[in-house]
């Protein structure tokens, strides 16, 4: 019941995805060959959210892996859990997208997309009651951004009533991997605004900061960053996979977090994050978790929630704890920091409690917030985009693949609209509505 189909695209998506499957296999007690070696019946009760059970009793992830070059796929295949995936579900080209969104979306990616969709259909038909799709990709490259958004829009056409959740890695403010990131990211956001239901916004710089500051790692690797992301990914869906007192699923999350359809870009966080050395001294209590979870330093994207206001937020707790205490802490947070929540959405924090904590912890929590400060991310990308687009720098790579400058202009204005919508709701107050009604009344009186 309630299956989720996982799709990973491009180098970044495949590396995050590989780490994610390590975490989920660990939680469900499944070893690298797909056999169950766990100890608790709860691990198997709803294992079918993420796994198919094959005839020989092996568990096979409902995962589709795609890329336009074979490199990353090969390393996933030779990695610790490489043998667990269905071999047919690796779909890859040979040419690569060369960090070019147009190649991923219109030329190279478009040639490969049908074989990816075949695999997606096959997996979807295996599902009893498909809840939705989760897509891992980055927005800075070519495949994850270009082909990723192409796949999302195709799936949207075919399964319009299923949830579409993305874990999107945005270009970082200070660290740039490629020059054309702002182009690729803007073109992708243009697609995500229209076709995705929920986007979890991540970026490497914020993740590096968490590794430096909180985890005290001197030289964090991408593996460390991806581990943080996968902890959050597993937290978002833990309620579907394990019994809980207050359940949430992808659709409940969306209903509670999205006040206006276009504003579905969320900040995510995870607690407890402790450095390896100091773990044993740390008392895990609900107040501790809550405090760290709402901490600005804990957000996995480079936007500071203190610069905006929360429209809505959701806290997912895992472990044995009293629901009363969870509710008290949530109310407490809202009362103490009331200026950081919009007052025209009362009770805008949803909490859920799942009984089974992640491996190695007694309790944990995942935070998902819809904050207007996320506009900082878009604004930054937009400034970089404009600087290059004004000079038409690097455009020939895109027009050469058949794109039109008009598309760039559209994407740019769509992103700027998004920024101003966030700004508008950040400034809105509860009593404005009343003023408009008075004006309407006066207008009628004049008539």
UniProtKB/Swiss-Prot annotation:
GO molecular function annotations of the record:
GTP binding; GTPase activity; metal ion binding; structural constituent of cytoskeleton
What InterPro entries is this protein classified in? Beta-tubulin_BS (IPR013838), Beta_tubulin (IPR002453), Tub_FtsZ_C (IPR008280), Tubulin (IPR000217), Tubulin/FtsZ-like_C (IPR037103), Tubulin/FtsZ_2-layer-sand-dom (IPR018316), Tubulin/FtsZ_GTPase_sf (IPR036525), Tubulin_C (IPR023123)
Keyword Protease (UniProt) = no
The UniProt annotation places Mg(2+) binding at 69
User: Which coenzyme or cofactor does it need?
Assistant: Mg(2+)
Subcellular location(s): the record lists:
Cytoplasm, Cytoskeleton
Q: Which residues bind GTP?
A: 11, 69, 138, 142-144, 204, 226
Q: Which GO terms describe its cellular component?
A: cytoplasm; microtubule
- Report which superkingdom the organism of origin falls in: Eukaryota
Location of the region described as Disordered in the Swiss-Prot/TrEMBL record = 419-447
In this chain, composition skew of type Acidic residues spans 429-447
The Gene Ontology biological process annotation of the record reads:
microtubule-based process
Question: Is GTP-binding one of the keywords?
Answer: yes
Q: Which UniProt keywords apply?
A: Cytoplasm, Cytoskeleton, GTP-binding, Magnesium, Metal-binding, Microtubule, Nucleotide-binding
Describe the family membership recorded for this protein in Swiss-Prot or TrEMBL. Answer: Belongs to the tubulin family.
Q: What does this protein do?
A: Tubulin is the major constituent of microtubules, a cylinder consisting of laterally associated linear protofilaments composed of alpha- and beta-tubulin heterodimers. Microtubules grow by the addition of GTP-tubulin dimers to the microtubule end, where a stabilizing cap forms. Below the cap, tubulin dimers are in GDP-bound state, owing to GTPase activity of alpha-tubulin.
> What do we know about how this protein assembles, alone or with others?
Dimer of alpha and beta chains. A typical microtubule is a hollow water-filled tube with an outer diameter of 25 nm and an inner diameter of 15 nM. Alpha-beta heterodimers associate head-to-tail to form protofilaments running lengthwise along the microtubule wall with the beta-tubulin subunit facing the microtubule plus end conferring a structural polarity. Microtubules usually have 13 protofilaments but different protofilament numbers can be found in some organisms and specialized cells.
Show the PANTHER family listed in the entry. TUBULIN
Return the protein name.
Answer: Tubulin beta chain
Query: Species name for this entry?
Result: Hordeum vulgare
